[in-house]
């Protein structure tokens, strides 16, 4: 049996039901619709299919951990407990983005540095290296603090799905002939 991953697909408000339909069509399990996002579970094939087929999602995020954190130590420990060495190579570049709403840890830049520090220490320990050059592939890490609950995500989409286009036009098209 394949590994079951939990994914979150954020979307614009009002498009949740459409996204729910798209996710069901992919064969995802345990679908939960909330304001501005749809959470679901599936294997690696569902992650790939979601990135290729979802039209109303902004991106597909892999949920790595959910835990309570009211102090920077709890934020660090929860992030350090994720097996980052299994997810990221030693030379990975991993920018951190985050948000905080109604939490005791309200300073996003401070939380970003704590999350980055936890990942760096875990990668150095897991890969048994002294430095991390961060000159390899880009892995976007995100965190969300909501009412003292932290969710850590790994972005599987790269550029936002809603910004991707199959046709790139270098010049504007003309509606009338010259």
Question: Where on the chain are the PLM-derived regions?
Answer:
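Single conserved hydrophobic/aromatic residue that forms the stacking wall/gate
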Residues: 167-178
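Beta-hairpin (beta-strand-turn-beta-strand) motif
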Residues: 99-101, 146, 155-157
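Conserved proline-anchored active-site loop of SAM-dependent methyltransferases
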Residues: 38, 42, 143, 174-175
């Amino acid at each position: 049996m394949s590994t079951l991953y939990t994914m979150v697909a954020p979307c614009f408000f009002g498009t949740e039901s459409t996204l729910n339909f798209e996710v069901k069509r992919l064969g995802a399990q345990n679908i939960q619709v909330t304001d501005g996002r749809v959470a679901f579970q599936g294997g690696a094939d569902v992650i790939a299919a979601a990135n290729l087929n979802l039209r109303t999602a902004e991106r597909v995020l892999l949920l790595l951990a959910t835990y309570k954190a009211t102090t920077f130590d709890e934020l660090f420990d929860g992030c350090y407990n994720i097996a980052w060495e299994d997810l990221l190579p030693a030379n990975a570049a991993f920018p951190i983005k985050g948000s905080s709403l109604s939490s005791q840890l309200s300073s996003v830049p401070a939380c970003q540095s704590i999350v980055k520090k936890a990942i760096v220490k875990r990668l150095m320990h897991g890969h048994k290296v002294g430095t991390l050059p961060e000159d390899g592939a880009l892995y976007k890490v995100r965190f969300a603090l909501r009412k003292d609950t932290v969710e850590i995500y790994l972005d599987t989409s790269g550029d936002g799905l809603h910004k991707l286009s199959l046709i790139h036009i270098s010049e504007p098209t003309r509606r009338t002939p010259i």
